[in-house]
């Protein structure tokens, strides 16, 4: 029996000083054993995003998928740190689950830390991130 897979992409920015790199946040939801896996060279604080994202989704009145969620932060060679990827991870997961439009989500650059209640908190380095978004032709941040 084939397992049904659902995929979605969102985008964020990784900053090293004033230089930024676009990070593709890919989410896959598969019909295998439930779990939440984050891959692509995340640091310890980013690994904690799994718990923030899960709580924020549930406390926003949405349903976190009861399936295996795999989130890949690409390119894997770029170091990712901090909580600014929370929003991109959450919208990518929700788009893969069908709760948001994948096409709409992929047109934006998503930057923000999530509170456990689902609120979006500001992050540092927004100006350099906006400049990178402009360079790659993304009008929505």
Indicate residue ranges for each PLM-predicted region:
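Peripheral, non-AAA+ core regions of ATP-driven protein-machinery
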Residues: 1-140
């Amino acid at each position: 029996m084939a397992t049904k897979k659902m995929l979605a992409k969102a985008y964020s920015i990784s900053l090293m000083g004033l230089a930024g790199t676009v990070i593709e946040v890919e989410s896959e939801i598969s019909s295998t054993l439930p779990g939440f896996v984050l891959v692509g060279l995340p640091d310890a604080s980013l690994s904690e995003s799994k718990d923030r994202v899960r709580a924020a989704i549930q406390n926003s009145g949405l349903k976190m998928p009861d399936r295996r969620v795999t989130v890949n932060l690409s390119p894997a060679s770029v170091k990712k740190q901090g909580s600014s990827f929370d929003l991109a991870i959450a919208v990518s997961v929700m788009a893969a689950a069908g709760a948001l439009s994948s096409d709409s989500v992929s047109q934006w650059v998503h930057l923000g830390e999530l509170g456990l209640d689902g609120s979006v908190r500001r992050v540092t380095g927004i100006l350099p991130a906006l400049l990178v978004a402009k360079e790659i032709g993304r009008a929505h941040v």
